[in-house]
Amino acid sequence: MTVGPRDVRAAAERIAGRIRRTPVLEPGDLTGASVLAKLELLQHTGSFKPRGAFNKLLSSAVPAAGVIAASGGNFGLAVAYAARATGVSAEIFIPATSPEAKVARVRAQGAEVTIVDGYYAEAQAALADRQAQTGALLMHPFDQPEVIAGQGTIGIELDEQIPDLDTVLVAIGGGGLIAGIAAWFDRRVRVVGVEPVLSATMTAALEAGEPVVARVGGVAADSLGSARVGDHTFPIVRDQVDPVVLVEDDAIRGAQRAYWDECRLIVEPGGAAALAAIRSGAYVPAVGERVCVLASGGNCDPATVTS
């Protein structure tokens, strides 16, 4: 199944009243150029992820066993939030390497939490075993068409909030967010992808011509460190995103600090990557180009930004 503007519009209608319409602002002298920022860090749970979680949940027949997901970060929190809001049970498999603060937030939403020794791959394996036993509905963090379409509803808001928009910069992890936004705009607006140099999974896939397993790490690995991009997300990015640029960890940290210094906003590393691309010169807007960066999340320790 491919994802297009009709799917994104249907998702927007489906999740209406469930998610916040997040603001766009011109956040001071962040770049030396006129750049707008879409503040998805102000979304429920602190990231864009509830959009896709709600759309997948509300467009599916949910079995008695409820929903199931593997995530140590924003998606697990979003699934727990969406499940609670719709009266559905949720079990989230979380790697033992995840910060306890994030685990506590998932539990606070009422989800059952299963801690798995190891990393995300081990959590996914444990999830697959449990799903086979229970038949619970799988919620994938980025590679389901319903999730992609839900994330794409950000594009609808951008159309309404910035009608003269030329370009939007979006960070890439597994590709669900940028694929959804690109699917909505369908080349009417330029969509630029941003990856950390140390987690350049989409770049590796584009070079190989297909999704491949890549080494990931760096300051934004907790949100942008998918070792392989999605089978659904890859062709959308390949066909509708140009270019994909790379940013260093120092540039990401600098963008986080700029959000704090200019706007008093706590933006997580993955959420600051789009701004880092402009501040570092990885993407240079043309004269008069109307540009928006997506601040996709704010779930990090404030002390890492403000100190």
Label for each model-derived stretch:
Residues 1-307:
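PLP-dependent amino-acid enzyme catalytic core
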